[in-house]
């Protein structure tokens, strides 16, 4: 089956995520649209950190689509909206087609509510609040040139806000990993068996651990700071409580293992700690250095780079003998904005290869494309995806 993903603000990272998780031949078409194929399963919008919308190809025209919508929802009100992502878009096209659909369904005796937008695309916030593609009877049609895609849903901004800002233990001083980026890091590990044990050796307040649990994986974390381990335990306990375990669909078998999972969270230096048990994948944000409000001068930059490099490589050296061949490791390490306006990286790729790791290849992408940042951000995150030889 053919699918369309509407990527967020960093489409190349979203492309890598979809290639790793769903289809290694996924392609970027246009500025932020990704086409991919998947058999025997449906992609899930709430699984992807880098996609704003997701649609499944409908093999037919608008006339056939009207019949399909009528059959999908035999009774009750229908809500419909259209987003046009075509290369050549005509003014008023989405409104005109929406009205045609409303009239056609009206002739079939159906009550129809149309969601419109001043722009060719319905904003993600509007689509989410109207549950387009998520609630029975609520549809968004994604138009791409001559193809029509039926929405499978929009990124759930309400759930992200809750997982980011409502959880009980947060600490702005240590930096805050966005849940979306945590999802991306885990997904870049590729498909993993259900219940796979995912390690975050720099777990902080537990964002990667939280997102791993929501995906059905067993979270395992350590951190140098005792306070961070306490925060991770509080946040996972919050996630596993009766309300949130239902809200975020935590698997019952994980809830049953809650106490064992919390007990395994430990204080430990990632460069020396000896982790117990099987580790199926590793996903983490490494130490990013001191917070900065402007590009660092050379002396400061060199000192921060040396410290961050020592920690990241020290961890890899430590964990290499503890994991099996083929184990994926996905890490976000710092890159610093310089006065030139470009980011300077840690330059650890050759060293990582010497340690016995292969770099995952992504079609039409290079390592320089995997830089996660916001406009003007001083410390960006370079994402590195490797697998033990």
Model-derived segments and their meaning:
Residues 226-228, 242, 247-249, 284-314:
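Mobile active-site "lid"/loop adjacent to the S-adenosyl-L-methionine
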